[in-house]
C-alpha cells in the first residue's frame, strides 16, 4: 500500500453550514405506514448487506438521459409514498408544474438570474433504470428556460433536474409502502438552484400528499459505501480512493487520505471473502487497517475523527447528502444503496 498522498489540510472557515430545504408538510396519510415501521428494521444498523448482482442498464433507457446523471453533483432527498401519482399523466403534470413555477416567479421569487418567465417543465419516464423487474420505474424531471436576450430559435437550456428512483428496494418493505393509490419512489436526486428545488418540492407535496426530507449520509454509511464500492471491478473511470476526515477541533480542519485503487482493492480482497454480501465486521476491519497504516505515517488517530466524504472510481459521496455518479457500469448498484438509505430516512 502506498503512503497517503495528502496530509492535514489547512484550516478553513466552517461557520457556513448547508441550508436545509424545508417543504410544507401536507399531512401525508398514515395508512399502512405504522405497520411498515413495526415489521421492518428502520434505522437499525445492519450486520450485513447484500451485494446487488451486476445488471446492465436496460436498452430502453435513453443514453443521453443516463449521461445527464453522470459526473454531476446531486443533492439527496427522501420522499414518502406519493398518493395517486400516475405514469400515464406525465404530460399533464409537466403542464401544471410549469404553470406553478411561472406563477411563483411572477410573485417575485428568484429562480435563476438571466432567465425569462418562459420556463417549462418536462417529465420523462426512465423505465429501464431499475435493478429488478418489480422496481417502480424512475422519473426524470427537467426545468428548461431560454436565456435572456437569446437569439431567435435558440434552444432551451436545462436549469434544473430531478430524478425519482426506487432501485433494488427491499421487496417486503416495498410491499408495505405501496398500494393501489400509493407509489413508492423514496429517493429524489436534485441538481439545480435551491429556489427551484423548493418550488418543485412544494408542488409535489400539494399534488401528491407526500413530504420531502434532506438525506444526510452518516460516517458509518460512508464506510459501507467505501467497502462495497471498492469491491466493484470498474473499467471506465479508475481513480484513487480518497477519504476526507473531519477533525473535531477549532479552527476546523480536514484530513485527506488517498490510496491507489490497486492497493485498496488488494486489501479488500484479503478481508472480504463472500460473494453475495458484505459483513459489518469486514467494513470495520478495512478501516482498522487504514487507520493503522495512516498512524504509522503521521501519528494521527483517524478513529478520533469523523469520516465526511468518500470518493471511489464508482461514485463519490459527502455526509451532507451530496453524490456524484462516476460509473455508468455500476449506476444501478449505487442507486440501490441510496434507495435503502432513503427508505430508512422516511419519518413516520
Swiss-Prot record:
Keywords: Centromere, Chromosome, Nucleus
The keyword Nucleus is annotated on this UniProt entry: yes
InterPro entries hit by this protein: CENP-L
Disulfide bonds listed in the record: none
Location relative to the cell: Nucleus; Chromosome, Centromere
Entry function: Probable component of a centromeric complex involved in assembly of kinetochore proteins, mitotic progression and chromosome segregation.
Family: Belongs to the CENP-L/IML3 family.
Stated name of the protein: Centromere protein L
Organism from which the protein derives: Xenopus tropicalis
Gene behind this protein: cenpl
Amino acid at each position: 500500500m502506498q503512503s497517503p498522498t495528502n496530509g492535514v489540510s489547512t484550516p478553513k472557515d466552517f461557520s457556513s453550514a448547508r441550508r436545509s430545504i424545508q417543504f410544507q408538510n401536507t399531512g401525508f396519510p398514515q395508512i399502512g405506514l405504522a405497520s411498515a415501521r413495526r415489521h421492518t428494521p428502520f434505522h437499525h444498523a445492519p450486520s450485513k448487506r447484500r451485494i446487488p448482482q451486476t445488471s446492465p442498464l436496460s436498452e430502453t433507457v435513453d443514453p443521453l438521459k443516463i449521461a445527464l446523471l453522470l459526473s454531476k453533483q446531486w443533492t439527496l432527498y427522501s420522499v414518502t409514498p406519493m398518493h395517486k401519482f400516475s405514469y400515464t399523466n406525465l404530460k399533464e403534470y409537466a403542464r401544471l408544474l410549469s404553470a406553478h413555477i411561472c406563477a411563483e416567479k411572477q410573485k417575485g421569487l428568484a429562480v435563476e438570474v438571466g432567465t425569462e418567465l418562459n420556463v417549462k417543465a418536462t417529465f420523462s419516464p426512465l423505465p429501464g433504470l431499475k435493478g429488478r423487474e418489480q422496481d417502480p420505474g424512475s422519473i426524470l424531471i427537467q426545468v428548461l428556460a431560454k436565456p435572456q436576450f437569446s437569439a431567435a430559435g435558440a434552444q432551451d437550456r436545462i436549469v434544473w433536474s430531478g430524478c425519482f428512483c426506487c432501485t433494488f428496494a427491499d421487496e417486503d418493505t416495498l410491499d408495505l409502502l405501496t398500494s393501489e393509490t400509493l407509489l413508492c419512489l423514496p429517493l429524489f436526486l436534485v441538481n439545480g438552484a435551491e429556489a427551484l428545488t423548493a418550488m418543485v418540492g412544494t408542488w409535489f407535496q400539494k399534488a401528491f400528499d407526500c413530504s420531502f426530507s434532506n438525506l444526510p449520509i452518516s460516517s458509518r454509511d460512508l464506510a459501507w459505501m467505501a467497502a462495497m464500492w471498492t469491491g466493484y471491478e470498474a473499467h471506465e473511470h479508475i481513480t484513487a480512493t480518497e477519504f476526507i476526515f473531519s477533525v473535531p477541533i477549532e479552527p476546523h480542519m480536514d484530513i485527506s487520505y488517498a490510496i491507489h485503487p490497486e492497493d485498496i482493492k488488494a486489501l479488500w480482497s484479503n478481508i472480504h471473502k463472500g460473494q453475495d454480501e458484505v459483513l459489518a465486521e469486514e467494513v470495520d476491519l478495512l478501516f482498522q487497517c487504514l487507520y493503522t497504516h495512516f498512524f504509522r505515517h503521521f501519528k494521527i488517530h483517524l478513529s478520533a475523527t469523523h469520516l465526511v466524504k468518500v470518493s471511489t472510481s464508482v461514485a463519490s459521496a459527502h455526509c451532507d447528502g451530496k453524490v456524484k455518479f462516476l460509473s455508468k457500469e455500476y449506476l444501478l448498484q449505487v442507486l440501490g444503496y441510496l434507495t435503502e438509505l432513503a427508505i430508512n430516512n422516511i419519518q413516520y
